[in-house]
From Swiss-Prot:
UniProt entry keywords in alphabetical sequence: Hydrolase, Metal-binding, Zinc
Protein name: Probable metallo-hydrolase Rv2300c
Organism: Mycobacterium tuberculosis (strain ATCC 25618 / H37Rv)
Family: Belongs to the metallo-beta-lactamase superfamily.
Disulfide partners: none
Binding positions (Zn(2+) 2): 141-142, 242, 288
Cofactor(s) essential for the protein: Zn(2+)
Taxon lineage: Bacteria, Bacillati, Actinomycetota, Actinomycetes, Mycobacteriales
Amino acid sequence: MVATRGRPCPTNFSRPQRPRVAGNGTKSQRCRGRLTTSMLGVAPEAKGPPVKVHHLNCGTMNAFGIALLCHVLLVETDDGLVLVDTGFGIQDCLDPGRVGLFRHVLRPAFLQAETAARQIEQLGYRTSDVRHIVLTHFDFDHIGGIADFPEAHLHVTAAEARGAIHAPSLRERLRYRRGQWAHGPKLVEHGPDGEPWRGFASAKPLDSIGTGVVLVPMPGHTRGHAAVAVDAGHRWVLHCGDAFYHRGTLDGRFRVPFVMRAEEKLLSYNRNQLRDNQARIVELHRRHDPDLLIVCAHDPDLYQLARDTA
């Protein structure tokens, strides 16, 4: 399958092992059985910016004595809820073995109360209110909760979908946990085309979600890893996923623990790309833009800073 133009396909596939993919009407991309507005060249209705951004911990972990978490964004919009990553999900908590042996390294707590689904319910919403999930990448600690939102459209770079689903290498087949998407999510792939955004050359506004959600390709950690920028009103939040692990990467005041540096190297798909994107992130951090907050997926201090200043 090839990258789509980011518009969801309403037709379900019969094989649950293959995520449903958006189409634009070409032979390899079309949705079988019915036309969509994207096939007819009809532009999607414009949607407004996010209303509120919540910062959730969806997975407490303890790797070799280092406290970590899964930093997830919950974005309220006029058209429903949007998640940036999901952390661990309910099925992960019920069956920890499904995330693989690496759980013995990260040592997740697997608390159902920390899942995005349960926290959304605590906020007074239903899981069906989640319309879109934007993934930084397909690692198990980022996508474990997607099965808790089966009707949400799952946005990802086409490169990441290729590496995880369509044409994974041997290393990628060992890395990803296919059971986490066995329910057949509605996959929306986004190609490499885009426009400049704060020093990054090819950012893609996700207009089908809203005017304030931007997918920023940052390959290196995985084949198609991306950051996600969200307009929170008084500032932009740039969720860098696993483009870096620790706040020490941003400045020299804090030393990145050896375990995290080793893990970063071990898990990187392309170290040169990873270093290049980290250099861009550091440069952006040093500008001290007052309307920008940079966070990553696993640093507890950056997570707390985001919550304290939300």
